[in-house]
Amino acid sequence: MEKIIVRGGRQLSGSVKVEGAKNAVLPVIAASILASRGTSKIYDVPKLADVYTMKEVLRNLNINVEYENGEFVVNATNPLKTEAPFEYVRKMRASFLVMGPLLARVGHARIALPGGCAIGSRPIDQHLKGFEAMGATVEIGNGFIEAKVEGRLQGTKIYLDFPSVGATENIMMAAAMAEGTTILENAAEEPEIVCLANYLNAMGAKVRGAGTGVIRIEGVDELVGAEHTVISDRIEAGTFMVAAAITGGDVFIEGAVAEHLRPLIAKMHEMGVKTIEEDNGIRVIGPDELKPVDIKTMPHPGFPTDMQSQMMALLLRANGTSVITETVFENRFMHVEEFRRMNGNIKIEGRSAIISGPCQLQGAEVTATDLRAGAALVLAGLVADGHTRVVELKHVDRGYVDLAGKLARLGADIERVVETEHELENLDAPAPLKLNTNLV
């Protein structure tokens, strides 16, 4: 079984470079379907399992795709197929983002019901509501969603019941080639939405207001291939910020954009963590003692749900009681049981987790229940006594490029291995945690 093994007790230091954003690159790749002429080149594409899945989805649609050295090249000028099969879509929820572009381009899409991390129902009704408002007919059956439109989609006004990132992206892409103007209200405001809008506009679309609650999309007749550089991954950056803070370390996160991380930075300051914003990244210096804080996840610009589990790991080390309230997903506390296996003192009350710290974490074998939970368990292992062994790395690989290797280069005692039962019997005793005494 492949595992990440962490032996706690080392203070992190040095520099780490953030990859292109997973949550930005997947919709950008989907949007490349809209280009009926020319070739699209997408830069800073991270080497992630989800990227390879999206590559196979596009190839299945008869699209030419090349991916090498962080550059994703797409030529979608061939006659398109319109079905994304379960084989690929089951692996990754973002595969559903091809529906909007296919509807806009050829008027038909048949997509298997999506998969991905099991962190809540995450319904796709808001996507379908938007397509139907633009004139599509939608049918669901036999594990597939099929949408059709006669002629072109029609621009209209759409109000989202919740500022869903995926629905905002799918509707934006569909509306880019609709007849007339679409006004999308209560839209998601994440930086990844702005990244997608910039790419669509480079292709010839007319998208205004991305990054605000109201987006206006004036439909055009044709989109062409374009070049685009993906924004840096704010969640990966945040994960390494927590790694520095939890170990009392001093780490520079190259490529981190402070404007994308304001809620996290604010909470870290409350906890006593020092951050220094520089032109090309953020330096994070962990304190000798962490203070407790309360956190409530919210759609952007609120605290990101994708940083909830990592912050829970950090709060386990804080001196006092903290409360995390999860408002975005109803089932995103599955990692709590894994933290408890490591001696984490956490109580669940409805949508809130009450963390009583500081906890002297103990190494254990734990399971990555989803993508971000896997990273959080690795973070906890950095300060746990003994060895922490994290399994189900398929989840971690969906969102992190060489997480263990990057942490090792910062000084962590960590490795990724195929472990046998015999090796489990020969693990050494833990090293003591060294505290940072050189704060600036």
UniProtKB/Swiss-Prot annotation:
Cell compartments where the protein resides: Cytoplasm
One cellular component term from this protein's GO annotations in UniProt: cytoplasm
Recorded metabolic or biological pathway in which this protein acts: Cell wall biogenesis; peptidoglycan biosynthesis
Positions annotated to bind phosphoenolpyruvate: K22, N23
Highest taxon of source: Bacteria
Gene Ontology biological process: cell division; cell wall organization; peptidoglycan biosynthetic process; regulation of cell shape; UDP-N-acetylgalactosamine biosynthetic process
Keyword Cell division: yes
Binding locations of UDP-N-acetyl-alpha-D-glucosamine: R93, R122, P123, I124, D125, Q126, D306, V328
Alphabetical UniProt keywords: Cell cycle, Cell division, Cell shape, Cell wall biogenesis/degradation, Cytoplasm, Peptidoglycan synthesis, Pyruvate, Transferase
InterPro entries listed in its UniProt record: Enolpyruvate_Tfrase_dom, Enolpyruvate_Tfrase_sf, MurA_subfamily, RNA3'P_cycl/enolpyr_Trfase_a/b, UDP_GlcNAc_COvinyl_MurA
Gene Ontology molecular function, alphabetical: UDP-N-acetylglucosamine 1-carboxyvinyltransferase activity
EC number: 2.5.1.7
UniProt key word Cell division: yes
Catalytic residues (UniProt): C117
Catalytic activity: phosphoenolpyruvate + UDP-N-acetyl-alpha-D-glucosamine = UDP-N-acetyl-3-O-(1-carboxyvinyl)-alpha-D-glucosamine + phosphate
A Pfam family assignment: EPSP_synthase
Residues carrying 2-(S-cysteinyl)pyruvic acid O-phosphothioketal: C117
Family: Belongs to the EPSP synthase family. MurA subfamily.
Functional note: Cell wall formation. Adds enolpyruvyl to UDP-N-acetylglucosamine.
Name of the molecule in the record: UDP-N-acetylglucosamine 1-carboxyvinyltransferase 1
Annotated source species: Halalkalibacterium halodurans (strain ATCC BAA-125 / DSM 18197 / FERM 7344 / JCM 9153 / C-125) (Bacillus halodurans)
Lineage summary: Bacteria, Bacillati, Bacillota, Bacilli, Bacillales
Encoding gene per record: murA1
